[in-house]
Amino acid sequence: AVFFMNSANLPAGNVQAASASSMKKAYKKYLTKSVSGKKYYKIVNIGDKNKPVLLIGTYKGFGKGSYTGCNVYYYKSGKVRKVGSLSDGRDIALYTKKGQNYINSGLSDEALYLCVKDGKSYLCAYYNSHNWKIDPDDKYEKCVIKKGGKVIKNYGYMDSRQYNTAKNSYRYKSTVKFVKNTRANRKRI
């Protein structure tokens, strides 16, 4: 007896996420076709499960190849899309917390950590309001977590102790060194 299965009645399997190598190929193509040769970029593993993410520098930093600001691009559903940006007063650096990598920038009283979760920017913004309970004028800004630009958690104002606890829960790995968008540099992707 010959038996045929109708594939229309089979359950759909999970759609496979893009591999790191296919993401890097997409970033290489995007850099070649859509980004000026005068721009600087870096690919860092801050995406979903530390998958590759493309950063394009926007504000030059304080050393060769360093930037204090960047746009963040992510490959999802067959396209490279801008998902966010990060900019502040310090050179962008790579940090880690609970196995997830983040990029960071900040000032003496603020620390911004960004990664990509579920294909969206995930920003943890911490601000030091010092002794705001004693001196209400010392309120700086509310500490929040944003996903895709929307606040998903509001911590309110943090005093120095709370701010330092939050900030120090991330571990420094390295400064992010951007490279010029040249054919030679893209070959190394």
Question: Where do the model's predicted regions map?
Answer:
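Repeated scaffold domains used in trafficking and secretory/extracellular systems
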Residues: 38-40, 88-97, 109-112
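Sec-dependent N-terminal signal peptides of Gram-positive bacterial secreted proteins and lipoproteins
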Residues: 1-12
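Beta-propeller blade repeat segments, especially FG-GAP/WD-type strand-to-loop junctions
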Residues: 67-84, 113-118, 146
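Short, solvent-exposed loop/turn segments at conserved positions within beta-propeller repeat blades
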Residues: 63-68, 135-136
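Beta-propeller fold detector
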Residues: 81-87, 153-157
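Acidic, small-residue rich beta-repeat scaffolds with periodic aromatic anchors
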Residues: 7, 18-20, 25, 29-35, ...
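Acidic/hydrophobic-patterned starts of short beta strands in beta-sheet-rich repeat architectures
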Residues: 47-58, 98-103, 122-124
